[in-house]
């Protein structure tokens, strides 16, 4: 956590570091938070909350945020301090010129344990660089390329105005945090530099596949909230609608594959119920997702179909290097 905080401190008084102690673990988070608050008054703010999980931690951070823009940084991760200064300069210049953007996107690095060659998630193929633009100017994303929490900075007021409220005691809310505000984003800025270091590979990490399967109920909870947060088929403009449907397909595919990989009747029933609910409540969306390549791939019949789904998933894992 110290490494995380220290990486943001070079931003000086232009940053507000809200350190939230969730109370979920008996560690020294609050002690460290208060230490930095005393050492850097006006920059660091220590906030304690009763255990509410990751989602409530983000909610608490947003409630306490007074800055123009809001970014979530996990305590295991860190920012490139030089790139942070560049981000602050861009935001400062845009603000002084009267240009208020809703979302700033920067690249992030997958810092995987034991891996020398780090994968960079860049958006140079999809977004124009160093200018304010809208969704109409967005190009197609590559397979495996998405806007994630690690890459996004949102305008604070926009997040509060759109009523973003993440569920308590739930992992995997990062997807909802990024997804739900997208229809409210009108002005975007892309900085083609590697700002965020995403530390992955620990055995106990929430994105570890075994851990995800053990928390599959929470993955499905987030999946449902993403489906219900807006009528995605009515989202404008068309390019944003296309992206949001694709991302929803990806999340639903992950939920489905993990249920299949678990091999338990309980989780296979979860998968069946999710697709049935989607069909009952949002038939046009269900039809679009179910008839697509991914929807067909995770709904192949029988044990042979499940084995083929898992094989395809493993090949995708190997190719893209996730988990």
Placement of each model-derived feature along the sequence:
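Catalytic core of nucleotide-sugar-dependent glycosyltransferases
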Residues: 193-202, 208-237, 254, 258-283
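All-alpha amphipathic helical-bundle segments outside canonical DNA-binding/catalytic cores
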Residues: 237-246
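P-loop NTPase catalytic cores that bind/hydrolyze ATP
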Residues: 245-257
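Inter-domain helical "communication" segments and dimerization helices
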Residues: 115-119, 123-125, 160, 217-221, ...
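Membrane-interface aromatic/basic loop that binds lipid-linked glycans or pyrophosphate carriers
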Residues: 261-323
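Nucleotide-sugar donor-binding/catalytic module of glycosyltransferases
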Residues: 1-218
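Catalytic-loop motifs flanking and including active-site residues across diverse enzymes
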Residues: 177, 222, 248
């Amino acid at each position: 956590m110290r490494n995380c905080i220290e990486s943001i401190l070079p931003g000086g008084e232009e940053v507000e570091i809200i350190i939230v102690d969730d109370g979920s673990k008996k560690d020294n988070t609050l002690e460290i938070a208060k230490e930095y608050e005393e050492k850097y008054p006006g920059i660091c703010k220590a906030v304690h909350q009763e255990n509410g999980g990751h989602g409530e931690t983000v909610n608490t951070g947003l409630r306490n945020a007074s800055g123009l823009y809001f970014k979530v940084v996990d305590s295991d991760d860190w920012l490139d301090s030089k790139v942070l200064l560049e981000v602050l300069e861009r935001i400062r210049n845009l603000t002084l010129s009267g240009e208020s953007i809703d979302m700033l996107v920067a690249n992030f690095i997958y810092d995987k344990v034991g891996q020398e060659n780090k994968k960079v998630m860049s958006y140079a193929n999809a977004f124009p660089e160093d200018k304010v633009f809208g969704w109409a100017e967005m190009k197609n994303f590559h397979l495996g390329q998405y806007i994630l929490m690690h890459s996004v900075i949102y305008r604070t007021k926009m997040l509060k105005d759109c009523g973003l409220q993440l569920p308590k005691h739930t992992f995997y809310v990062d997807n909802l945090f990024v997804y739900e505000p997208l229809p409210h984003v009108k002005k975007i800025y892309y900085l083609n530099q590697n700002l965020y270091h995403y530390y992955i590979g620990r055995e106990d990490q929430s994105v570890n596949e075994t851990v995800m399967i053990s928390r599959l109920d929470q993955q499905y909870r987030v999946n449902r909230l993403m489906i219900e947060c807006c009528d995605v088929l009515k989202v404008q403009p068309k390019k944003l609608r296309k992206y949001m449907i694709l991302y929803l397909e990806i999340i639903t595919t992950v939920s489905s594959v993990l249920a299949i990989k678990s091999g338990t009747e309980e989780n296979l029933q979860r998968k069946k119920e999710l697709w049935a609910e989607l069909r009952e409540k949002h038939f046009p969306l269900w039809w679009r997702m179910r008839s697509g390549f991914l929807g067909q791939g995770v709904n192949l019949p029988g044990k042979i179909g499940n084995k083929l789904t898992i094989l395809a998933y493993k090949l995708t894992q190997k190719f893209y290097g996730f988990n």
